[in-house]
């Protein structure tokens, strides 16, 4: 298929397509016209858009536009390339470092490099959806163009200002090299290292880690030999290193990984560590220098050395596998084997893949690659050359997923600080810079409903637009888990309630005991001999007895050693360090399960008491770019309180974990930043006060507490509502019980007449009058004392049961008459609860019983009460209804009419 022509009408385009299919079979098969010539294509370049195109003569070193359209044209063929400046490539903390003659380092901040301008672009070929472009305009147009499954290199011609060479990448001058590993070693350091998590957590963590963008804060170092090969031009070397990073960033974008360059360093005076043709020695020397010198002065995740030294054999790079984010192994070395920076970029991407846990793509793995082998294949091929690979295979993606799920790359989830992108601030570059509330890209590509793509501001009612702690344009509550722990040595992170971003990943301090595993944490991973045996030999494998480690690893040969001294010599293990050399196992599969080039090394050791012990080791025919997978991994427990470090069994006290844990008062653990991660209900930083748990690094643990508090409040509210509803329904009954039935002290002592007399009720005025007369005729000495009014009222309760009939009761002579004082009578028992008998004799007998005294004293004026009683007796029936009511609560006894009144007198005793 030819390059897309200038825009034409749809009908004409259809006719041209049909004619092309009939007359140009080779083009119909997808073979580009740009690839049919044997010699390099010489093209002219121009910039512009539409019908206005200006020839490219040179670019101003200080002015590189944010968006650039380039047209490459030769005769009737043309390519239009749409480019955007790769704003996220260089962090705001980016520094350039070189050295003076006396060895003093000079670090220049971003404000210096902005003078040179940001001249690194990513883009695509117009009309080709699967195309990819990575170019630099620092010194003319230079870079990589991929379309129609072909890779092309664009380079400026020395003899012309706007003439360029465009040729297939397979013609690029390069030294064909090999990573040297021809076996499949999937997940050597990762597979089965941890107990399998629950399926729910595995699915959730997989979605989170794969969906979230990972950021590798990278430092690239050029050794002295590279500086010399580039003509000792310091600026040229720096631009070359940044261009390499620009290509690598393009390679890793499909994996949702961004390469953020935080620094470049050039050893222009001398090498800062030993760099020789032995790649193994050079790698370890560089990693030691990074740990001791570079890390303390420059924070970063990974460092790569680009060397101008030609390594021995076919090795063009080397890196430890699954070592990303570690302090001692997160790095690699790369040989700059091509005139074009693309060659070193492909090798650096390969070695960085090893750091990510990716293994080589081999035939027995059945990997799927979008690019055919003759067109370059995939980046993790064991052997690389030309054409250069540009994509990752399905195996690489799977290895990366497995490594992330195992806890690798704990440092990759924090967004690097970006106050202002290198080269200037721009709305639409997907980086939230100073003064911006959000940035979702250009308006035509923005899919974020919380962000205004035109102004990079939040929409109305939106609080946030990006981040794991932002949901539906609102901040998640404090204590919401945003990143769970991935293994027994990892710590969870929680939203703070104030930021849309999840806190940076933290893990247990090195030397901390693993949870539920007999081992110690190291770089956020729990390593044990048993897990490594399962990795090498499959399920059922276990570590061999200690005598196997001691006998085999004391040999100092390829099958038993404590690491390499050089490329061809091995170190013997001391007795105390034997469990830090080649791992020895028992059981498992009949042969190693890590790859086709791994063989079993079996050793029989006789015992003094008879018999033999079978020790099984592993030897892998490696290249030179990867360490021996049969060696015990760093951080593995080798004795109680000791772990393997640098092939030596060392005490965990070297990490200072106990001193760090003491400040947590036994209510928390120490994380890798030497801060306390407190239990729930205890507050950081020292877990000595009540709080919400967590740490100053990972946010508060409040999710469970919030749920409990919310549930408690809801239950309380529901109970109150239910109680209020019941009260409302029973309000009349409650009011009657609480208010209408209450009596005062005096009212409780009074006899209240029933409001409605029972059936058959007879007025009792006659009886009351009869009794009243008797009382009048009673001798004075028979009455109770004047100062004791209780007898009168109690006797009234006993005998005066009903009002008297006013017709039969004679009216008293005077209402002012006062009854004579009553003498104290003998105490009588309580009044019977049933009516008195009809016979007078029985009534008289019952009168001898003395009733119980009242529970509360009567008022202090009995005389006045007696007077009122007399007045009440003299009232008429009409007056009686409204007067003082002295009727008892029980019905009055029925007296027979035939009882003579003259012969009976009721005595009140």
UniProtKB/Swiss-Prot annotation:
Coiled coil feature spans: none
Cofactor annotation comment: Binds 1 zinc ion per subunit.
Domain EGF-like: 656-688
Enzyme class: hydrolase
Disulfide cysteine pairs (residue numbers): 325-411, 367-395, 369-378, 482-502, 660-670, 664-676, 678-687
Molecular functions per Gene Ontology: metal ion binding; metalloendopeptidase activity; metallopeptidase activity; SH3 domain binding
GO biological process, one term: myoblast fusion
Protein name: Disintegrin and metalloproteinase domain-containing protein 12
Organism this protein belongs to: Homo sapiens
Origin organism lineage: Eukaryota, Metazoa, Chordata, Craniata, Vertebrata
């Amino acid at each position: 298929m030819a390059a897309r022509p200038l825009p034409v009408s749809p009908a004409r385009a259809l006719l041209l397509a049909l004619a092309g299919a009939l007359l140009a079979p080779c083009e119909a098969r997808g073979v580009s016209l740009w690839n049919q010539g044997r010699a390099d294509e010489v093209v002219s370049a121009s910039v512009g858009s539409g019908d206005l195109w200006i020839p490219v003569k040179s670019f101003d070193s200080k002015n590189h536009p944010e968006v650039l359209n380039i047209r490459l044209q030769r005769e009737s063929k043309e390519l239009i390339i749409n480019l955007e400046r790769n704003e996220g490539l260089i962090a705001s903390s980016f520094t350039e470092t070189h050295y003076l003659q006396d060895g003093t380092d000079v670090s220049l901040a971003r404000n210096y490099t902005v003078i040179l301008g940001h001249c690194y672009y990513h883009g695509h070929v117009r009309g080709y959806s699967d195309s990819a472009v990575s170019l630099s305009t620092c010194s003319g147009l230079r870079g990589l163009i991929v379309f129609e499954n072909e890779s092309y290199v664009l380079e400026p011609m020395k003899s012309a200002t706007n003439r360029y060479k465009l040729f297939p990448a397979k013609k690029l001058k390069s030294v064909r090299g090999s990573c040297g590993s021809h076996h499949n070693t999937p997940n050597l350091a990762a597979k089965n290292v941890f107990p399998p998590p629950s399926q729910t957590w595995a699915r959730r963590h997989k979605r989170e880690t794969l969906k979230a963008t990972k950021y590798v804060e990278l430092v690239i170092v050029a050794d002295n030999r590279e500086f010399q090969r580039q003509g000792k031009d310091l600026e040229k070397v720096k631009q070359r290193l940044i261009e390499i990073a620009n290509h690598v960033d393009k390679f890793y974008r499909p994996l949702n990984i961004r390469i953020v360059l935080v620094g470049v360093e050039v050893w222009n005076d001398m090498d800062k560590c030993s760099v020789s043709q032995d790649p193994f020695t050079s790698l370890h020397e560089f990693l030691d220098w990074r740990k001791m010198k570079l890390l303390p002065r420059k924070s970063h995740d990974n460092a790569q050395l680009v060397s101008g030294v030609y390594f021995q054999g076919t090795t063009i790079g080397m890196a430890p596998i699954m070592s990303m984010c570690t302090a001692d192994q997160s790095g690699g070395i790369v040989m700059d084997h091509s005139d074009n920076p693309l060659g070193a970029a492909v090798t650096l991407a390969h070695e960085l893949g090893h750091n990510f846990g990716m293994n080589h793509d081999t035939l027995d793995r059945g990997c799927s690659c979008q690019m055919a082998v003759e067109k370059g294949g995939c980046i993790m091929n064991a052997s690389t050359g030309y054409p250069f690979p540009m994509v990752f295979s399905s195996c690489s993606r799977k290895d990366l997923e497995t490594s992330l799920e195992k806890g690798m790359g704990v440092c990759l989830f924090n967004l690097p600080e970006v106050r202002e992108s290198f080269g200037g601030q721009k709305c639409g570059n997907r980086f939230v810079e100073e003064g911006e509330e959000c940035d979702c890209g250009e308006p035509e590509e923005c899919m974020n409903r919380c962000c205004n793509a035109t102004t990079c501001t939040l929409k109305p009612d939106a609080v946030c637009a990006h981040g794991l702690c932002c949901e539906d344009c609102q901040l998640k509550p404090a204590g919401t888990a945003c990143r769970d722990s991935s293994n027994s040595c990892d710590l969870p992170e929680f939203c703070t309630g104030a930021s849309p971003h999840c806190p940076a990943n933290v893990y247990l301090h090195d030397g901390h005991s693993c949870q539920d595993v007999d081992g110690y944490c190291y770089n956020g991973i729990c390593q044990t001999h048993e897990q490594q045996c399962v990795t090498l030999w499959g399920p059922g494998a276990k570590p061999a007895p200690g005598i196997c480690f001691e006998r085999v690893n004391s040999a100092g040969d390829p099958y038993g050693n404590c690491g390499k001294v050089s490329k061809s010599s091995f170190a013997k293990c001391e007795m105390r360090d034997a469990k830090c050399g080649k791992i020895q196992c028992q059981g498992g599969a009949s042969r190693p399960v890590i790859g086709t080039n791994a063989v079993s090394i079996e050793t029989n050791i006789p015992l003094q008491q008879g018999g033999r012990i079978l020790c099984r080791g592993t030897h892998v025919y490696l290249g030179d770019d990867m360490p021996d997978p049969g060696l015990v991994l760093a951080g593995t427990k080798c004795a109680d309180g000791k772990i393997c470090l640098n092939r030596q069994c060392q005490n965990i006290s070297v990490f200072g974990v106990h001193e760090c844990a003491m400040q947590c008062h036994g209510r928390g653990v120490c994380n890798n930043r030497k801060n306390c991660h407190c239990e729930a209900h205890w507050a950081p930083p020292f877990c000595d006060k009540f709080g919400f748990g967590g740490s100053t690094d990972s946010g508060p643990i409040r999710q469970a507490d919030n749920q409990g508090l919310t549930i408690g409040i809801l239950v309380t509210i529901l109970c109150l509502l239910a109680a209020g509803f019941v009260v409302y329904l029973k309000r009349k009954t409650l009011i009657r019980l609480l208010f209408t039935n209450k009596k005062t002290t005096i009212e409780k002592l009074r006899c209240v007449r029933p409001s409605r007399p029972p059936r058959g009720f007879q007025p009792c005025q006659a009886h009351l009058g009869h009794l009243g007369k008797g009382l009048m005729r009673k001798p004075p000495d028979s009455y109770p004392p004047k100062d004791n009014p209780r007898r009168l009222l109690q006797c009234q309760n006993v005998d005066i049961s009903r009002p008297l009939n006013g017709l039969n009761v004679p009216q008293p002579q005077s209402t002012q008459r006062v009854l004579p004082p009553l003498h104290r009578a003998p105490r009588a028992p309580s009044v019977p609860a049933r009516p008195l008998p009809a016979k007078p004799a029985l009534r008289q007998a019952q009168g001898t019983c003395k009733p119980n005294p009242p529970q509360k004293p009567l008022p202090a004026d009995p005389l006045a009460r007696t007077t009122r009683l007399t007045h009440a007796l003299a009232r008429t029936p009409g007056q009686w209804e409204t007067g003082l009511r002295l009727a008892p609560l029980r019905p009055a006894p029925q007296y027979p009419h035939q009882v003579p009144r003259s012969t009976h007198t009721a005595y009140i005793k």
